[in-house]
Amino acid sequence: SLQGSYARFKQKEEGYNRYSLLPRLRLGYQFSDNVFIRYRGQISRKSPGLSDMGNVRQLIDSLQVRSGNPELKIFTVYKNELEADFRKGLFSGNVHLSYQYQHRPIMEETIRDKNNSFVRTNANQLSWQKLNPELELKLGPLKDILTFSFSTGINYYDSRGLDYHHTYTNWYYRAEVMASYKRWSGFFQMENHRNNFYGETLSYGESFHTLGLSYRYKRLNIGMMILNPFVDNYRMGGEMFSKVAPSKNWWYVKESCRLFVAKVSWNISFGRKYETMQKRVNNEDSNAGTLKSGK
């Protein structure tokens, strides 16, 4: 498919007008009843935010200043995804490979001005790339009770600025076990940090595990869940890899460890089943599609 876009911005004497044609391609092929492969590719444009283009300086603290950049330009994003699904009996899986390239992306930079202040701003840098292979495997349900799933992947980042170049690799995983027997069901889920790197900033994702159990009786459902039952420390954070003003920060939330959650629900969707049955019984078209006339 092909679509177009138009972007216009003007601030005093600065501004831009941009017309774009944005192609998108989707392909798929089924090798057999158990194997299917698909490809998706697209080109898109990203415009700078108005707040980033404002010629305004804001004080962050006694040493840092946030500044806009009215010279920011639209940049181009290229995305490619290749995916394959396969199934054999109780075993199924998915292989996913994605690649993204951004040309002259708007990313951060930090400079030191004549007042010895660190000015944090954005500029059209050289390029940003992300490569992400991922594998997902699933087994079950075994004896109509147990289901196992596991996924793992790698995020590789290449961030090139006008005066910096950073690469970063992150391995991540996610595992889950689900069980269901009669009116009871339970699950255990865990995953580690899935981090993101853009410009000169590394943002750490969440790392947690969860244990849950529920019981269903007719329309009543009672459940409980414990977040991070086996650790006593939960944190999130990030790092700035600027050569003039590097930094690291963490947020510790102890309340998110061994956090107990209870849930009680009641299904009150009465009448819906009766209406559905009536529609099935009366699913008859008696209209012949002609007008009737009579005296």
Placement of each model-derived feature along the sequence:
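Outer-membrane beta-barrel strand-turn architecture
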Residues: 21, 27-33, 76, 86-90, ...
